[in-house]
Amino acid sequence: MNIGIDHGYYAIKTRHFSFPAGITAYSHEPYTLQNTLEYGGKFFVCGTGRQPILRNKMENENYYLLTLAAIAKEIQQRGAKTECSVTIAAGLPLAGFGREKKSFREYLRPSSQPVSFKFEGVPYKLTIEDVKLFPQGYSALMI
């Protein structure tokens, strides 16, 4: 399955969804599972507020976690199986495209696969087969 994701500073955008690029971590299950990602024994509410603008989006795991949430939302919208293989199409700003391309690909495609998590209480098991990177704004058109 091909999924285009725009990792913006303000919002994460896919073909069917747009939600704020903020994330809040909890050590316990929040009062609602709406927009909640469970990963690595922690809970993350996705789309809450905004995170500070980072010069390097790979500085922490926030954009990776938001990517998992975006993939889960797209899988749910498309009625696809929650255990599947995914190719991500993502954009990078032109200014850092050549410099960040390899590291952003590795950031979005971990060496430990498949990736298991829960989103809104639903278990997912994904194999991220490939990450295709394009100049920002082009990924939606390319895949």
Regions found by a protein language model. Give the residues of each.
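Nucleotide/phosphate-binding catalytic cleft detector across ATP-hydrolyzing
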Residues: 1-143
